[in-house]
Amino acid sequence: AAFGYMPQTKNNSAGGATFGGVLRAPMKYVGAKTYNINGQDNTSSTGNPNAEWNSNTGEFIKNPDSDTEFGNSGVINYLNKFGRTGTTQGLYKYYDPLGELYYETLRYLQGLPPTSAAISGVTTALKDGFPVYTTWNDPYGGGRTPSSDYSCLKSNIVVIGDVNIDSSGSSRYPSTSATNNVPDRTGWLNTVNTLEKRASSNYLDA
């Protein structure tokens, strides 16, 4: 899967900045084969319909997920085409709210929906020439619910960026809800800030 920012024209302190990040390409198998939730090969006789490269030629496929709005899609394409999908070529994202992007990614891996702030007011211009998925399917499948235990599922998040990120106001995160796997982000943020200052802090790691 690939998450990314939408174009920002304001930083968070100025108000009115676009919240966090959005899903640009859903979780899937990008190669010739697919597998079920138990890791068993379940590739159809015609191959993986969402494969991102041609297994015969090795060429990348421009629109592997059959997007009808931009005719451009896929995990690899999103990574390869940073700043080159919108109307202005070479326009890269800035005022990056990395914490919010990371939080949205965690919600996706937990089987939760996107926050309303992340997907409200999404215009064609904000999509920047690439799909934005405002409804999500649980990437792990298996009939899990948002309150299910995801602790044993192995996940990895790779962040591509620079040091010039825009700190996010903690008030923009959803309210804590232990039953729905929404942790106390503000509390943990304060704990990390305290520890990074090499100060003492009491916290419960539950």
What are these regions (language model features)?
Residues A1-A206:
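P/S/T/G-enriched low-complexity
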